[in-house]
Structure formats: structure tokens, C-alpha cells
Design a protein with these regions (language model features):
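Catalytic centers of hydrolytic enzymes
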Residues: 1-208
């Protein structure tokens, strides 16, 4: 690939970074990136066939939007160039982990309750849907939370079930540190497919 190589023609007016930081609602820029996470993992070399239930993208990792017209390799890199992997390649790698249904609901509550104060933690999800009431007490704002299947059907979340979640390394570390920052009040622990806590998230990086 070269920087000016055209990857796609775009006729969509994508959300701006300003909108993502000032409006607490679904944004098409976050949606397309989270959808791309799932596509990348399910088409990666060595994919084990376990479908991805949820992909999570926080607004703080999105560095640029896409304008109408040509979308080049450089445009894509600029939009998501934050961080570096242990392989030395720019951009945080994608990681694969598992969360319980209860933890997915907590992630939704974190977005509903905290992201207005910490806009970089605003979450854009593929597969996870929720509604909230901004006038309710903090950590009690979410009024409905569920998954969406491949055909758009509603899937109820089971609190004790493990769900396959894909995000980038930065986000995985951020979510995993919630328990430490809240002194255990909020518990959100990335796990492997057997439910064992993951000690080093970099070991879960998706490598093509």
C-alpha cells in the first residue's frame, strides 16, 4: 500500500470529531470503525471461527474523519493512528477477549454515566445497543441494553454468559483499569474464552 492509494469512494457525510465530543448519541463514524473491527477479526489469518458479539471503539482513539470523495490509505491511517503495538507498527493492535453479560451492561452504563464528563471515553459499539435516561442517577441511567444479531434481531443479554468482544489495545487496557480506579466498585475484567482473567492484553493481539 502507498499513502495516496485510493481504497474507496465515499458519498457519506461522516460525523466530525467535534460532533463526537459534543453530542452523546450514535455516530456513523464510530459505527463504521466498530463494524470494521469485526470484519478485520473475522477475516484475519488464523481466525478460530468464534463469532464476534461486540466491538467497542472509544471516541478518544479516533483521530480524524472521512470527507466525501476518495478515501486513501493515508486517510485511514490518519483516522486511527494512535499508539503502537509490540511489533513496532504504528496504531494500537486489535485484541480479542471475553466479557460477561453483566460486564457488557456495565460498559454501557459507563458510557451513559461518565462520557459526558470524559468525552474521550465515549463508546461506539457494534453489536451492543442501549438506551438511557440522562436525568437518572449516575450508574443507573441505562434503561434498556441488548445485543443485535447478524440479521438485526434483538438478543437479550445473559448476565453470566461470556461474550466475544473485540477492541483495540488502548480500550482494553482502559476498561480493565476501571476496577482499579473505582477501588473494586466497578468490576470489568477481560477474560479468555474459558473465563480466565487475561494478565497481558498484548498477548491477545490479532495478527494477520
Amino acid at each position: 500500500y502507498t499513502s495516496n492509494q485510493v481504497l474507496a469512494q465515499n458519498d457519506i457525510a461522516f460525523s466530525s470529531l467535534e460532533e463526537m465530543s459534543t453530542k452523546h448519541e450514535e455516530m456513523n463514524l464510530g459505527d463504521i470503525i466498530s463494524d470494521a473491527y469485526i470484519y478485520a477479526v473475522e477475516h484475519a489469518e488464523g481466525y478460530n471461527g468464534d463469532p464476534v458479539d461486540v466491538a467497542v471503539v472509544p471516541s478518544g482513539t479516533v483521530r480524524d474523519t472521512y470527507t466525501k470523495g476518495d478515501i486513501t490509505v493515508g486517510d485511514v491511517f490518519n483516522s486511527f493512528s494512535l499508539g503502537i503495538g509490540k511489533d513496532g507498527v504504528c496504531g494500537y493492535p486489535l485484541i480479542s477477549s471475553y466479557l460477561t453479560g453483566k460486564e457488557l451492561k456495565l460498559a454501557a452504563e459507563m458510557d451513559a454515566s461518565i462520557s459526558d464528563f470524559m468525552t474521550t471515553a465515549r463508546l461506539y459499539c457494534s453489536g451492543l445497543n442501549f438506551t438511557y435516561n440522562p436525568h437518572r442517577m449516575i450508574l443507573n441511567k441505562v434503561t434498556d441494553c441488548y445485543l443485535t444479531g447478524a440479521d438485526g434481531e434483538r438478543i437479550e443479554i445473559e448476565d453470566d454468559k461470556l461474550y466475544h468482544v473485540v477492541t483495540d489495545l488502548y480500550t482494553g487496557q482502559m476498561l480493565g483499569s476501571v476496577m482499579q480506579m473505582s477501588y473494586g466498585v466497578l468490576s470489568l475484567q477481560p477474560k479468555d474464552k474459558d473465563g480466565n482473567p487475561i494478565e497481558n492484553l498484548e498477548d491477545q493481539a490479532i495478527m494477520e
